[in-house]
Amino acid sequence: MKFFEIGEIVKSHGLKGRMKAKSYVENGEDLSSVHEAMIVKGKEEPRGYKVRKIVLHKTYFFLELETIDTVESADSLVGSTVLIPEDDRAALSGDEYYWRDLMGLQVVTEEGRFLGRIESIFPTGSNDVYVCAGGSREILLPAISDVILKIDLDKKEMVVRLLPGL
């Protein structure tokens, strides 16, 4: 079974083992179907847990795991990475992508000129914006069909058309 990172535990939250974690998933991603998680702390072996509850809130999520029911047990996991099975990811339509899959993609123009790599992504009211860095300058690319022509996750490449002003 393949797992992917969804966040890092930053602190305990409350008295019953609830934890607050910095989220690596975009706000609004549905995590309600997550029933198990792997927790990895440093170079230790991953440990599997049943998920009681997971709630996404802005750039964080709150996590409750079976057997983690005290402040002390939650505190012992601070700094750990939280991973969930690939199968627990919500299905996306053909033109939608998880942010984590876009991070690091090589960005090239339709003429083949290298611009950089996707370094970060942020939402706006109408569409996401991809931050491309590593070339001659940082470029903000709106996630619209006029700009983003093709995304090839197998080649780890995004082909773009630069509009005037970009």
UniProtKB/Swiss-Prot annotation:
The keyword Chaperone appears for this protein: yes
Q: Where in the cell is it found?
A: Cytoplasm
Enumerate the UniProt keywords alphabetically: Chaperone, Cytoplasm, Ribosome biogenesis, rRNA processing
InterPro entries (alphabetical) = PRC_barrel-like_sf, PRC_RimM, RimM, RimM_N, RimM_N_sf, Transl_B-barrel_sf
Any single GO molecular-function term of the entry would be:
ribosome binding
User: Which Gene Ontology BP terms does the record give?
Assistant: ribosomal small subunit biogenesis; rRNA processing
Q: Gene3D superfamilies in the record, alphabetically?
A: PRC-barrel domain, RimM
Write down the superkingdom of origin.
Bacteria
> Which SUPFAM superfamilies would you find in this protein's record?
PRC-barrel domain, Translation proteins
Q: HAMAP family, per this entry?
A: Ribosome_mat_RimM
State whether it acts alone or in a complex, and with which partners, per the record. Answer: Binds ribosomal protein uS19.
Comment, domains: The PRC barrel domain binds ribosomal protein uS19.
The protein in question is named Ribosome maturation factor RimM
Organism listed in the record: Syntrophus aciditrophicus (strain SB)
Upper lineage ranks?
Answer: Bacteria, Pseudomonadati, Thermodesulfobacteriota, Syntrophia, Syntrophales
